[in-house]
Amino acid sequence: MFRLSHYLDQLYHPTPPRIARGTPKPVVIWNLTRRCNLKCKHCYTVSADVDFPGELTAAQARETLEDIGRFKVPALILSGGEPLLRDDLFALAKRARALTRVLALSTNGTGVIGSKADRVAEIGFDYVGISIDGIGATNDAFRGVIGAYEQALAGVRSCKRRGIKVGLRFTITEQNESQLPELLKLCDDEGVDKFYLSHLVYAGRGNKNRGEDADHARTRRAMDLLIARALESAEGRGHPLEIVTGNNDADAVYFLNWAKANFPAAQVAHLRKHLEAWGGNASGVGVANIDTQGDVHPDTYWSEYTVGSVKQTPFSELWTGPDPMLAELRRRPRPLKGRCGACAHQAVCGGNTRIRALQLTGDPWAEDPACYLTAAETGTATDIDRLTVRPFIGDRHDPKPAFV
């Protein structure tokens, strides 16, 4: 996750960068259930409104939660599917509140009303993220259910009335990019605390719909708008909205280039130190995933690669064990190839999102086709052939993944 507002603030109010020693404890994103009342086009878990066999039992989930607490992860995000559809969500969340420093809920928002909204407030979640992918019918088409927009908006308002910090999550595609200005206005009108723009990741239904990914021009236009909006908040103009992006760490380099054009060299050098201390893509390093079956992955999109299962081995042991793919992800620099391997900004970006490269080439270290930076911006040769996105036409037409 690229915290645009945070790093913009470093240009105005600089603080020393914090250099991590060794591998940090990860933020854990835990998919508690695959069941969901929506059918989103980008869903990486391919969720549906049915029961899925093999999900963690209440006892297994409690045991895993205690291990996470002892491991002292910096943050725990409870997700799904739709986590509010898991019967023991609030029991788990109440215990998690006592065990973790930061506790967040990732929801489609349609169920955060009435008594359930009261329970969310009582638990004391630090943050509730609600997904909205367009205004009105655009969101409903994206999420597969008519009325989903109004229900999610009701969830946002329920959170705000109860004093819960709430954010909107928006996945950008070619179909909804034009509505980004309206969504930012919605944040201002509703007093939303955070806006999270997610770039499309080619996992689950997101892979099947990868042909609808936003092209590079749309992505650059969206980033220009987000930077301008973050600047308003940094300068004390309008509603104070925190801006973050995810799943395309080229955003950090794009922002760095914007800073070069608008701030003195000394401030830009300070910003780069902070961005290098952050390091870009955090899969297998600062982010971990436990899926609904209890399988552990480098992040939520790495379902093709499993480190192990918490049904057999505690998460803490799996994460600190000798897994070869985790070891490769933690290398700096990473063993990147193609355009990413030749890029001058690997220390900032970390190689971007490896899953897009994996889906198109079978190689987790190939270049990321969603990098929208030009050859001049990356310092790469102009004659390097770009990896382009082929629309999905079936699994048998994609290369099989090859890991270490």
Swiss-Prot record:
Please state the gene responsible for encoding this protein. Answer: nirJ
Annotated GO biological processes are: heme biosynthetic process
Q: Which SMART domains match?
A: Elp3 (SM00729)
Q: Which family does it belong to?
A: Belongs to the radical SAM superfamily.
Note how many cofactor molecules are bound and how: Binds 2 [4Fe-4S] clusters per subunit.
**Keywords annotated in UniProt:** 4Fe-4S, Iron, Iron-sulfur, Metal-binding, S-adenosyl-L-methionine
Binding of [4Fe-4S] cluster 2 occurs at C340, C343, C349, C371
Q: Which PROSITE patterns does this chain map to?
A: RADICAL_SAM (PS51918)
Designated name of the protein:
Pre-heme d1 synthase
State the organism named in the record.
Dinoroseobacter shibae (strain DSM 16493 / NCIMB 14021 / DFL 12)
* Gene Ontology molecular function, alphabetical: 4 iron, 4 sulfur cluster binding; catalytic activity; metal ion binding
Entry cofactors: [4Fe-4S] cluster
